[in-house]
A protein has these predicted regions:
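Phosphate-binding P-loop
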Residues: 1-2, 120-122
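ABC-family P-loop ATPase nucleotide-binding domains
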Residues: 54-114, 124
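Actinobacteria-biased recognition of intrinsically disordered, low-complexity terminal regions
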Residues: 2, 85, 149, 164-185
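Conserved catalytic loops of ABC-family nucleotide-binding domains
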Residues: 123-126, 135-168
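Short alpha-helix immediately C-terminal to the ABC signature
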Residues: 114-121, 148
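Short acidic, S/G/P-rich loop/turn micro-motifs used as interaction or catalytic elements
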Residues: 13-15, 56-60, 133-139, 164-166
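ABC ATPase nucleotide-binding domain signature region
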Residues: 10-76
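Pre-Walker A (P-loop) beta-loop-beta motif of ABC nucleotide-binding domains
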Residues: 1-10
């Protein structure tokens, strides 16, 4: 439900992205359905669920600067995305100092905060699916705190990460109920 953060674990390189695509209504599962408000409606799911940092799908190219990432995401959100607006967003977020840094070189926590904050600017977004934050390294508790922070704003948050990160968060992160045997066989 909304206002909650859930963790799903998935191994192999492709599986987290596949789960993310299914959970965000961008791919049909072989079996089962994704429901929003109890009804199956892929276009509504796609509008309401932001797929965040999914490898090869929604992650920014590694050599792109933070400034460019922010400018593009502001545009996708229907916001002013000119250099002045982009600089203002970065300043307000306290990130102007890293604006010229390639996104691949940004600390994991800052990278995820940038991408999550920009995702929630989109008009209809009610839920976030964050894919493989553990691939950037760092402490899983840091990105889990981010997930809980966004859930605290009333968003539904699903984080899909590897089992090692899941083990670190055992007892802390509420688990998503997904039948792994039916997904991406």
């Amino acid at each position: 439900g909304s206002g909650q953060a859930r963790l799903a674990t998935a191994e192999t390189e492709q599986r987290p992205t596949v789960l993310g695509l299914i959970a965000s209504g961008r791919m049909r599962p072989d079996t089962g359905v994704v429901l929003i408000g109890g009804a199956e409606n892929n276009s509504a799911v796609r509008r309401k669920v932001a797929l965040v940092d999914a490898p090869d799908v929604s992650d920014p190219a590694p050599n792109v600067t933070v400034f460019t990432v922010v400018s593009e995401e502001l545009m996708f959100a229907g916001r002013p995305s000119n250099p002045i607006a982009t600089k203002a967003w970065l300043t307000e977020a306290g990130l102007l100092g890293i604006s010229r840094t390639p996104i691949a070189d940004v600390a994991p926590a800052d990278r995820l905060r940038i991408l999550l904050e920009l995702s929630v600017l989109r008009p209809d977004v009610e839920a976030l699916v964050l894919v493989s934050p553990d691939r950037h390294g760092g402490d899983p508790h840091v990105w889990w705190e981010l997930a809980e922070e966004f859930a605290g704003r009333g968003l539904a948050v699903l984080v899909i990460a590897g089992q090692a990160a899941g083990a670190v968060l055992a007892g802390r992160a509420a688990r998503a109920e997904m039948d792994e045997t039916e997904v991406a066989r």
